[in-house]
Amino acid sequence: MPIDQAYAKPRTMRRTAALAAIAVAALAGAWARRDYLAWLALGEGGLPANPKGWLITSYLRLRKADPIATAVYDAQIHTPGAAAHLGPLPGRRGPRPRIAAWPIPHRQLDQFPGPEMRTALERVFDDALRTHAGAVHSKLSHFEKRNSAVTLRDPAAGHPDARLSKGETAHIHPNDGSMHMIFSAADATSVLDAGWGERHPLAGVLPELPSTYIYVYPPRDGAELAIVAQLLNAAIEHMTSTGTDQSGDRQHRPPKAPTTPRRTHLRGAPPPTPGQRHE
């Protein structure tokens, strides 16, 4: 074989490999750009809204657990601190909302309530803050970083979950009315089985997230709003418990009324306009 032909074949192979690498890099770059922009569209919540935040949540996607499975709670239900505070729950009608692929922020993609329902939901949280004013107050969310949360006044005196969450018990995502709440294992099982929410995909995976950190779907009507009020009350009862209660033996601390009641609130932002960043 002529020497020039012998060298031509490796050069062709190297050129082909280089072109293939360029094509793959271009496709990967295009996918990354689309994925990054779609993630930004969810709004802020827990991570910085920049490439660093996207890289973190992209890595955490690999660690997500099944958000609907309740087997994780089976071993906990009969242990101290896992008692039920909820009564029987009716099943939520219709399919569950579609949930975005990224674990942070944890958001849904459809079934959004109207502004009137979001306002009514804020009133439910306001009422809970007043009812349990001796035990909880409104404070900047430890998890979301940008909006308010129902938080224990003294996390050290509450359930071990409260110490893990810095006292945070529940918060609303102002853009769509979805929520996160922390329940007992028994109540988390009931909420998931009845279709009212799902487990955060990193709950129990990351050490700072209790395994019963649950995403609660936003209410669509008055009947569902009443269910959410029950869920919120159960979450507060769980977090203010001593951690030694067992099924049928609730030993949570009753809230003490303050001497001078104060108006507390968890006000959300109005729905964002297209392209606007939200929590």
Question: What are these language model-derived features?
Answer:
Residues P2-E279:
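Charge-dense, helix-prone N-terminal extensions
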